[in-house]
Amino acid sequence: MSPSFSGAAIRQAFLDFYAQRGHQVLPSASLVPEDPTVLLTIAGMLPFKPIFLGHQDPQYPRVTTAQKCVRTNDIENVGRTARHHTFFEMLGNFSFGDYFKKEAITWAWELVTEVFGLPPERLVVSVFREDEEAFALWRDAIGIPPHRIRRMGEEDNFWAAGPTGPCGPCSEIYYDFKPELGDEQIDLGDDSRFLEIYNLVFMELNRDSEGRLTPLARQNIDTGLGLERLAQVLQGVPNNYETDLIFPIVQKAAEIARVDYFQASPEQKVSLKVIGDHARAVMHLIADGVIPSNVDRGYVLRRLIRRMVRHGRLLGIGEPFTLPVVETAIQLAEAAYPEVREREAVIKAELQREEEQFLKTLERGERLLFDLFANVTASGAPKQISGADAFKLFDTYGFPLELTQEIAQERGFSVDVQGFEQEMEKQRQRARAAHQTLDVTAQGSLDELAEFLIETEFLGYSQSSARGVVEALLVEGKSVPQVEAGQSVQVVLDRTPFYAESGGQIGDRGYLAGDGVLVRVEDVQKRGDLFVHFGWVERGILRVGDPVQAQIDLACRRRAQAHHTATHLLQAALKKVVDPSISQAGSLVAFDRLRFDFTLSRPLTPEELQQVEDLVNTWIAEAHPAQVSIMPLAEAKARGAIAMFGEKYGAEVRVVDFPGVSMELCGGTHVSNTAEIGLFKIISESGVAAGIRRIEAVAGPAVLEYLNERDSVVRELSAQFKAKPQEIPERVAALQAELKAAQRALEEARSQLALLQAERLLPQAVAVGNLQILAAELGSTPPEALKTAAEHLLHKLGEGAVVLGSVPEAGKVSLVAAFSPAVQKLGLKAGSFIGEIAKLTGGGGGGRPNLAQAGGKQPEKLAQALQVAQERLQAELSSGLGS
């Protein structure tokens, strides 16, 4: 292997190339991004996202970087394919409103062909199907033959960093590992032949949460060249793991496992590659400040470490082994990323602690598993570990399913994987149903603290501010003596005015202020008798025992109060207008809206919804005062107070009463008079389950915000239609009628065009005895018109068979077969025949013996499929006629 093509040399050559073309070389950003919408830095462009969005001015018009990235969305493929990784380096050049497509394409080609010496004849490029400018540049400016420029759809060649944010069409350079197959078989989806090495994104659009695309303030360039991928090509190795960037780590793991990598079994190689990959990710994550935990990026790190340990066990390594492996990773990375050596002690300490802890988990899990083996054997039942037991091992003891399966197999047992997945889905449903804010470790820590901490005194019914003392601080689920600026923290006070989430009402927001310290509180949760304030330290140092002034955000509290009281009024109105037997099935009381689920087997009519809304607003206008009292549960029920079905209440309950309107058992906060709500507006009514309906609504200031948003939409529609607001429904109806008429006319025109085109296909028919065969492609003809054309052709041909195919839209194939009675008598059925042909295009279908339709999703294989159809028809009809 030439030293000039080492991983380090590739990285430096890339940066030097663009530095010579006016780019500022910037160091890699941290794997912990400033962007709150993503856990980790997943792409080279992520540090520049604010610039691409126009939220921040660039310091330099052109930059180039070698960016550390971590992605875990395909973690199960790591080690099993040649190119999947969790950690990788993305080399990139970026332009912020400076150069655009021409320069990006020209320089990319110059770099890969002249600097790295890749033969042009082994390169293929792709462009977005609608990007004519990029296609012309590759063809005319670079000189690539058109057949080696592939037009691709949005799924392949329209790039985005995520569901929202900067995006745009892209163009990719692929390396051809098998040029001897020729240009006739260029399929960029064939990973064994083609490897994408360079992606050029022409970043000119922004996609919002509604999926709308709008132009960015500047036309930008964002490129990405995978260092590991290019190293594989230049170093002539079969996969990324055998490049000099990773292979020394793999070899170290093999040495510890006493395995010869080149003589290892396929599964052993997978484990060695997983260890080599994860070691790099773990090293860089800890170096960038991530520590193992059960939440967010800390959980990603913990999972990677545990996968390393598990794959070590699969290799037969029974003792801790990760430190020498990561030391090799540090040696490889320290020249480019000095921080990994500077934080070596932290990296190894966190890794050692996590590995030792997980090994204990594995030992404990194995003991429990062996007990299960013994119990099942003694019972005489089939040798299978139930899904519930496998899930308990996983969920309670962190014992991986794969390890349970491996050990079970060694003992002649199977594992009910389907049952395990069912238990996993149940847990996901529980997680979705419950607002989880504490991780498992944090819950355990609080349980321990609760043994000696006093119950938090809640003052929030009468006070918005109160003096309290810090009883406990938790970071990442662990009790700590102090926290500093920039840290997320959970604070337990001896007394607080903050309402903790319960009864559907979300927790208060606000702040805790002390001597030189300020903690912003974003949520409050109740754990037993303790109120836990979730937030982050904006400035100063907060210590256990410090006195603080706890102040709620009054504006948020008032919004929550308005929505909570409105929820009570809504339930009362539903009982009065719709059905007295209606009962609450769930609720959400937030700052910006309310949601009320209730029992009813049918949708509400528009008239009922309006009556309910009007009645609530009437009660608001009547200014009913609130009366709150504490009384025995039996007395409250005797007075007619509404209790939520299934809720557990103590001997004494809090009753919120708006006399003559509503009386409920409730621990939430409310307005002192219904007039404080102002207005109430129902937004929607829908079904959420059998017998359960849901109303979403807004109250108080949120009504004005909702109406302003609606008004903005109406004004925009008025401008678009050049009509008064009251005229919009009529204009929309007219437009819909015009659209339907145009669609009918278009379909008719397409059918006529298809028939004209079909007529031209008649000379292509082939005679087999007295039968005529025709298999042909009919452009972009829609399915219905294609069927009409097939019937028309069969009528013209007389006795025979017609198979037609088309590509009605990108990524879709339409097929139809029409067989005459004479063909059917020979045993050929249109339905089964076209179904088999459709499989060749990645689809399926069928229908009647005389006429059938099918579809596919691989247009590039349509011509081949039609050729197969022609050959099969000729062969089978010849055979039938001959017999």
Curated annotation (Swiss-Prot):
Its cofactor is Zn(2+). This is Alanine--tRNA ligase. Catalyzes the attachment of alanine to tRNA(Ala) in a two-step reaction: alanine is first activated by ATP to form Ala-AMP and then transferred to the acceptor end of tRNA(Ala). Also edits incorrectly charged Ser-tRNA(Ala) and Gly-tRNA(Ala) via its editing domain. Binds 1 zinc ion per subunit. It is found in: Cytoplasm. GO terms for biological process: alanyl-tRNA aminoacylation. It comes from the Bacteria. Signal peptide: none annotated. Its EC number is 6.1.1.7. Zn(2+) binds at H564, H568, C666, H670. Belongs to the class-II aminoacyl-tRNA synthetase family. PROSITE patterns: AA_TRNA_LIGASE_II_ALA. Consists of three domains; the N-terminal catalytic domain, the editing domain and the C-terminal C-Ala domain. The editing domain removes incorrectly charged amino acids, while the C-Ala domain, along with tRNA(Ala), serves as a bridge to cooperatively bring together the editing and aminoacylation centers thus stimulating deacylation of misacylated tRNAs. Keywords: Aminoacyl-tRNA synthetase, ATP-binding, Cytoplasm, Ligase, Metal-binding, Nucleotide-binding, Protein biosynthesis, RNA-binding, tRNA-binding, Zinc. Its main location: cytoplasm.
